Amino acid sequence: MIVGIGIDIIELNRIEKMLDGKLKFMERILTERERGVAEGLKGSRLTEFVAGRFAAKEAYSKAVGTGIGKEVSFLDIEVRNDDRGKPIIITNTEHIVHLSISHSKEFAVAQVVLESSSR
C-alpha cells in the first residue's frame, strides 16, 4: 500500500551557483559517501549529480510528510546506485522506498513513492 508520494524539481543553474562555495554546500547536502562519489566529477556532471541528490532528498522528505528540517535532514538520507545503476535511498525507515531521478538541460527532478513494508 502506498503511504506517501513526494516530488521535487530544481534548476541546475541554482545548484551550480551554490557549488561556488563547493565544500560547505556539499557538506550540508551530501553524506560522506556521496561526497566521495562527487569528488570524481567535474563541471555539468557534478552539477547534475548534486542536483539529483538534492531533489531526491527533498522528494523523500515530502513523501514522509515532514520536509527537510528537525525530523529529517539532508544527511539522514543517502542516495546510492544499485548494481544496475538504479538510484536507491538508504535511510532509517520501515517503508519500501521507490526513487526515480531525471535530468534535462535546465532541471533535475526526483520522485519518491513510499510503500508499506507489510504486504
Curated annotation (Swiss-Prot):
Organism (species): Bacillus mycoides (strain KBAB4) (Bacillus weihenstephanensis)
GO aspect biological process, one term: fatty acid biosynthetic process
Gene3D superfamilies, A to Z: 4'-phosphopantetheinyl transferase domain
GO cellular component: cytosol
Job of this protein: Transfers the 4'-phosphopantetheine moiety from coenzyme A to a Ser of acyl-carrier-protein.
Protein name in the entry: Holo-[acyl-carrier-protein] synthase
PANTHER family linked: L-AMINOADIPATE-SEMIALDEHYDE DEHYDROGENASE-PHOSPHOPANTETHEINYL TRANSFERASE, PHOSPHOPANTETHEINE TRANSFERASE
Membrane-spanning parts: none
Cofactor(s) recorded in Swiss-Prot or TrEMBL: Mg(2+)
Catalyzed reaction equations: apo-[ACP] + CoA = holo-[ACP] + adenosine 3',5'-bisphosphate + H(+)
Gene Ontology terms for molecular function: holo-[acyl-carrier-protein] synthase activity; magnesium ion binding
Residues binding Mg(2+), per UniProt: 8, 58
Keyword field: Cytoplasm, Fatty acid biosynthesis, Fatty acid metabolism, Lipid biosynthesis, Lipid metabolism, Magnesium, Metal-binding, Transferase
EC number(s) given by UniProt: 2.7.8.7
Keyword Metal-binding part of the UniProt annotation: yes
Family, per entry: Belongs to the P-Pant transferase superfamily. AcpS family.
EC category: transferase
Keyword match Transferase: yes
Family matches, as HAMAP family: AcpS
Entry's localization field: Cytoplasm
